[in-house]
Amino acid sequence: MAQVARETKVATQVAVMNEASKATRLLTEWIAAGVIGQVREAHNWSQRPYWPQGIERPKDPEPVPDGLDWDLWLGPAPARPYNHVYLPFVWRGWFDFGVGAIGDMGNYSFDTMFRALKLASPVRVDASSTPRFPETYPVGSLIHWEFPAREDRAPVTLHWYDGDLRPPRPAELEPDEHMSDVEDGEGMLLVGERGKILCGFEGQNARLIPAGRMKAFEPPPDDLPKSPGAYEEWIGAIRGGESPRASFEFEQKVVEAVLLGSIAVRMGTTLEWDAEHERIKRVAEGRAGDLEIANAQINPPRRAPWELA
């Protein structure tokens, strides 16, 4: 889709909204100004999933509800009898329909981190989790992406936690300080060579830790270009203006990382990624056939008549 958008010069936008937020812009300015030095680690944690995961396929079919075209709802996914465990909303936890917690929320927070840290394609992705199941994502998972040096930026490792998992509490926090957002229990932590930034899940309410450093902090100039707003960017692009910041071309790399993370969770190991050829080139501790199984998940087969030409 990103390639077609480039070739046709069609305006595109992914509705993540972070690209237009003050929080993302300020975090990007702090990192660019070297407030905490070169960032070597980024941590991002979510309370999700709050839908069922780590379950088996139900054995007993149920009557299809009136008004639901079950075959149409399945689309390209393999056929199966109807059961309420698949919809609505709860489809997120199933391999054939969703991408688990990382797919549900990673597109938002990763948008912020990809901008602030100038990230592109990872070279390696590793995952571990609670017990794995044949068709659903686990209850909790840890995913780690290794990104190489970019322009003037050092290599960085991005760590994701879901299922109520989170990184160790920073020693810089006072006992009465909250590590996670008090409303949703989620957060983001950027670790640099000269300090740490703690913020909400998508980069909001950023602050330096310890608190004493934040009190003495003199922010860098707020001089990055400001967005008129995500909707305004979209309308302007339709009318022939600049491409939206959250274009398919930019978000392609975000989605690539998220999907690689989900594949690593399903495989339960480390994957080495060849971004140029868009393929997994090695599966750590792989059994015979694991590399083929992992690569098949990049472009899974589609049920007729939903094939793509």
What is each PLM-predicted segment?
Residues 1-10:
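Rossmann-fold NAD(P)-binding glycine/threonine-rich loop
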Residues 4, 26-30:
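Active-site Tyr-X1-5-Lys
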Residues 18-20, 49:
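Short "lid" loop at the C-terminus of a central beta-strand within the Rossmann-like core
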Residues 25-26, 37-38, 43-48, 52-249, ...:
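Contiguous beta-strand/loop segments that form the cofactor/metal-binding neighborhood of enzyme cores
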